[in-house]
Regions:
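N-terminal export leaders
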Residues: 6-10
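N-terminal signal peptide c-region/cleavage motif recognized by signal peptidases
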Residues: 18-20
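Short, well-ordered beta-strand elements
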Residues: 25-38, 55-61, 160-165
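Short helix-initiation/N-cap motifs at beta->coil->alpha
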Residues: 37, 59-71, 168, 189-206
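Short, polar/charged alpha-helical segment
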Residues: 37-56, 178, 182-184
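Acidic helix-start/capping segments at beta-turn-to-alpha-helix junctions
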Residues: 61-78, 85-90, 97
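Short, Asp-centered acidic motifs that coordinate Mg2+ and/or phosphate
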Residues: 79-80, 215-217
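Contiguous mixed-secondary-structure segments that line small-molecule binding/active-site clefts
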Residues: 85-178, 182-186, 190, 195-199, ...
Length: 307
């Protein structure tokens, strides 16, 4: 090969390498979300605010539950999705650690664990706490003086008529229903649980509100907007069984390195999402039937994050 041919070959290699880099940088950021109401809301908010800041995305909202989402991001099938700090206890088998009951400490712990093991980066969290809860129909709670899970456990011990609507994840995970049962000394029989497809509390709350199949209680989240409006009361958790579940965007390090401004773009939005704000936004979807993307867009426009 003479010098001219060598030079031509080198130029071709350089051109191909440049094309490859450009193709990678032009590839859209794959944004996923969980299947529940708040997952859809947060997923759409992330997509809208990133697009508004010139970051190309592929919207993969409503993929599945925590297990599905974790599998997708660790396998590189998605780049980013909103997760909850308290799920670190389940993901990394640290359910017994008290660190998850503290918002800041729990965030720092999961941030370290996920980066060290999976090179997944936890960005700034929201101040909200979307923890798991059990909500009971108001007339049942009033008639039996049920205000806390301690009250509920004692009432169930006397043979109280109770049937819970919940997701499979809530029923199966050791840090969910099982943790409540252990802490408050009750055990539901299979016929006392109606397991519903997906993980959407809009469905479980509706089942309790409509007394579907005899249901009079529901799995709920701390930021659900439909609980009180549909005549349910959340049982207080005086023993603090559940971790703090602060929503936060998590992203593969490789994807973040390609566009570092993602962290800066998402931080102001998540800072605005306190508990009452998320309850109000979730209610628009759960109660008013508004589309999650519309609710997300309207909120971002009202805060000046979207034109």
């Amino acid at each position: 090969m003479n010098s001219i041919q060598r030079r031509a070959a080198l130029l071709l290699v350089a051109a191909l390498a440049t094309d490859s880099v450009l193709a990678q940088s032009a590839a859209p950021l794959r944004v996923g979300s969980k299947i529940d109401t708040e997952g859809k809301l947060l997923g759409n908010m992330i997509v809208l605010v990133l697009e508004a800041n010139g970051i190309k995305t592929e919207n993969k909202s409503s993929l599945g539950n925590t297990k599905v989402m974790r599998g997708a991001i660790t396998a590189g099938e998605i780049d980013l999705y909103p997760e909850y700090t308290g799920n670190g206890a389940f993901i990394f088998s640290e359910e017994s650690s008290p660190v998850w009951k503290n918002a800041k400490a729990g965030y720092e712990r999961v941030k370290t664990l996920d980066y060290d093991k999976n090179k997944i980066v936890w960005l700034e969290p929201s101040p909200a706490n979307n923890t798991w809860a059990i909500a009971v129909r108001k007339e049942v709670a009033t008639a039996n003086k049920l205000q806390t899970l301690d009250d509920l456990g004692k009432w169930l011990g006397t043979g109280g008529q109770f049937k819970l609507a919940a997701s499979a994840e809530f029923v199966e995970r050791s840090d969910a229903l099982s943790a409540f049962q252990t802490a408050y000394s009750f055990k539901l029989k299979p016929e006392q649980v109606l397991t519903l497809a997906g993980g959407d509390t809009a469905v479980t709350i509706k089942a309790a509100a409509e007394k579907t199949s005899g249901v009079n209680a529901a799995m709920a989240y701390g930021t659900d907007g439909a609980v009180a409006a549909l005549g349910l009361v959340i049982m207080d958790d005086p023993k603090g069984v559940q971790p703090i579940y602060a929503p936060a965007p998590i992203i593969r390090e490789e994807a973040l390195k390609k566009n570092p401004k993602i962290a800066m773009v998402l931080a102001p939005m998540f800072k605005l999402l306190d508990g009452p704000t998320l309850q109000g936004l979730n209610a628009k979807i759960q109660l008013e039937g508004q589309d999650a993307k519309k609710v997300a867009g309207d909120f971002l426009k009202s805060k000046g994050l979207l034109k």
